[in-house]
Every structure is written in structure tokens, then in C-alpha cells.
């Protein structure tokens, strides 16, 4: 039996995180549809409205890394799974802390209070976990193209940039998760942001490759 045909050993846990992940998206979409069709409905929720926005956002951002960790656990094994989690989160955290403090490598920006609390008062705790989760997925996608290692890593970093192309308008404009301090060319985003995403992502996936990559390894 091949690794892809085996039942997932943590199927129940995987389904729980998948349910939370999908449910948070469905709840958010339903809420946005309601407010678009009946904007006056927002007034009925009063002070609870921000929580109806924050809770599904937190559920989404916490369930995504949990889902990725459990999904890939049989492939990576416990030790490599933890190392990938720590490395991706650490690099993402450091890049964000440096970025919010200096304006490099992403450009001048700051996180709002929407995802409080924050690490050192600058970066929401869930953000580094998102770097880990999405970078594992993009490296896996790039690896499936069966290209040389250097091409695979560059593709993974480019996939991360494409993720940000879709993410930034939603999180920087649609939801007030962060604010740009400049008037950039793309939803206020400066061009340096994509360069910063590429470099940060490349550092993350290079570390993943050093730690064994994302390929399945048969264990005894």
C-alpha cells in the first residue's frame, strides 16, 4: 500500500480542524453577504459585532496551521513536523518584527488592534503560524512539479508572493488587520513588499530543505 492510499492516522483530529477551518470561512462569507444585503443589520448586533468578526478570523488563523501540522504529520514524522513548525514560525516572526520596527523588508506598515495581543506589541501571535502553514503548502505544491531543487525553492517563494497578492487587499483594506504608512501602487502596498515576501519565503523554504524538505519518507 502506498503512502497516499493509507488512511490518515489522525483522521478524527484532522476532520475537527478542517471543520473549524471551513466553518470559519462559511460564517465569514455569510456575515459579509448579510451586511451587503441588509447593512442595517449591523446595528442590531451592537457591541457584539466586532466579536462576530474577530472570532471567525481567529478560528481561521489558528485552525489553518493546526490543519497543516496534522495533515502532514504522517509524511514528516513528529520530529521533522515540530522543526518545520518552529523554523517557519521563527523566520516569519523575525521578519515581521523587523518589518514593523524598521520598514524593511516589506515597507512601512503596522498591525491594528484587530488581532491583538501582539508579540512585543508589534506582531499578532497568530501571524508567525500563518507563515509556517502557507510556506509548507507552497513548498509541497512546488515539489509536485518535479523540478530541480533550486527551481523548486524559487517556485515555492513565488507561490508565497502570489498568496500575498490575494491576501493584502483583503487584510489591508477589506479587514483592518494592518495598515500601510505609504500610498503604494497596489491597495497602498509598496513594491518592496513583494520583494520582502519573496526573500522571507525563500529563507523559510531553504530551512525546510535543510531540515529534510517536504517529501514523504518511509519509516520502519
Predicted feature residues:
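Aromatic-rich, lipid-facing transmembrane alpha helices and their immediate juxtamembrane interface loops
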Residues: 2-220
